[in-house]
Design a protein with these regions (language model features):
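Radical SAM enzyme [4Fe-4S]-AdoMet core and its adjacent flexible, acidic
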Residues: 1, 67, 133-138, 142-263, ...
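Conserved alpha-helical substructure of the radical SAM core
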Residues: 2-138, 329-330, 335-340, 347
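Short, intrinsically disordered, charge-biased short linear motifs at domain edges
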Residues: 40-45, 240-246, 286-299
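Processing junctions and N-termini across compartments
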Residues: 44, 48-51, 251, 298, ...
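Short cysteine clusters
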Residues: 50, 54-57, 257, 275, ...
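Secreted/processed peptides and extracellular or luminal domains of membrane proteins
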Residues: 56, 60-63, 263, 281, ...
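Flexible, active-site-proximal loop/turn residues at the rims of small-molecule/cofactor binding pockets
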Residues: 63, 93, 145, 208, ...
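Flexible mid-to-C-terminal extensions adjoining Fe-S/redox cofactors in radical SAM and related proteins
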Residues: 269-347
Length: 347
């Protein structure tokens, strides 16, 4: 069956269970909109180990053991106590965790909305069905180029079969993200078109320098980026990423970042960090992270915000664009080296 024919069938299959899930999400978002103390999304690292070694990634290693199931369940319980809406399981490669399905079940059982990031290599028909049965709401698959190169191994050629399996069997939402700059611009456009042909949301994120700011694009890359932005299915995504066009045009975006409050990252050691690109900022045990921490982070401007290209940061802050940030910025610097994260615990 061709990709186009598969896409004509798959959306009907995916919609069957999505309406109820979408309604649950909308109820959670509505509750969070009136309660600024509630986190919208937490990125929960389940393992640092990854089966790939992409040149731009500093969030993995090849040796770390998975976070124990009991520890993950305790962290999920704490996120539920805080009223978190989304929990995104990430790594490393989450599919390397032997108890991933049970982790997803626990997220769902606690009334939270489970999502996950993956490079897709370990997906099988059986795993996709198991993820669906466990209650997974959304999956983001990284796909950067047509064929593997020195920068990224997340490529359409080896993953095309995995995409077709997702189109045929996934009842959860699927979004495919391309890091713009991991391959020639024409390849990014070809990937986006191939993904859209299968009925998935095709998104493109800007590559970042070590400080977290976006790398500049030349005229050719800007033109291709605009073509990807104009793909019809970009308008169907749950969260818009239109801030990227403004960032490319003006070099900055004026917004109020709610890192550490509306969204944050929980590392393998159970510490809360403002966000993944700024690991080390605000590192504090999740078990001790409470309303005062959320409120302080909510009210604190972030000096890196104007040039931030991180989509979930902007998305997680949109509910509160009108709410003030009266505190001065007083963030400690991040401490990290490629491939490993060095943490300073704040109590």
């Amino acid at each position: 069956m061709s990709d186009a024919a598969l896409a004509s069938i798959a959306p009907r299959h995916r919609r069957r269970g999505q309406l109820r899930a979408d309604l649950r999400v909308l109820r959670g978002l509505a509750a969070a909109a009136i309660d600024p103390d509630r986190p919208l999304m937490a990125h929960l690292i389940v393992t640092r180990r990854c089966n790939l070694a992409c040149g731009y990634c500093t969030e993995f290693d090849a040796t770390s053991p998975p976070v124990p199931l009991a520890a993950l369940k305790a962290r999920i319980d704490r996120l539920a106590e805080l009223g978190t809406v989304f929990v995104t399981l990430t790594g490393g490669e989450p599919l390397l965790h032997p108890d991933l399905i049970e982790v997803i079940r626990h997220v769902r059982a606690r009334g939270l909305t489970p999502a996950m990031n993956t490079n897709g290599y370990l997906l099988t028909r059986e795993r996709i069905r198991a993820l669906d049965a466990a209650g997974l709401y959304a999956l983001q698959l990284s796909l950067d180029n047509l064929t593997p190169n020195a920068i990224s191994k997340k490529s359409h050629k080896p993953l095309r079969g995995k995409l077709r399996l997702l189109a045929e069997h996934a009842g959860f939402r699927v979004r495919v993200n391309t890091v713009f700059g991991a391959a020639p611009p024409a390849e990014a456009l070809a990937v986006a078109r191939a993904v859209s042909a299968l009925g998935f949301d095709a998104k493109c994120s800007l590559a970042r320098d070590p400080s977290g700011a976006p790398l500049p694009l030349d005229a050719e890359a800007r033109a291709v980026f605009a073509q990807i932005a104009a793909l019809d299915r970009r308008g169907t995504s749950i969260f818009s990423e239109d801030f990227q066009e403004e960032l490319l045009e003006r070099g900055r975006v004026d917004w109020r970042c709610r890192a550490g409050a509306r969204f944050f990252t929980v590392c393998e050691d159970g510490l809360v960090h403002l966000c993944t690109p700024k690991m080390g900022l605000g590192a504090k045990p999740l078990a001790d992270y409470g309303r005062d921490d959320l409120r302080r982070a909510f009210a604190t401007p972030k000096p890196c915000a104007p040039t931030c290209p991180v989509a979930y940061a902007h998305q997680g802050s949109r509910l509160d664009a009108w709410r003030a940030q009266p505190l001065p910025s007083s963030l400690p610097p991040p401490t990290r080296v490629p491939g490993r994260v060095h943490l300073a615990v704040v109590r």
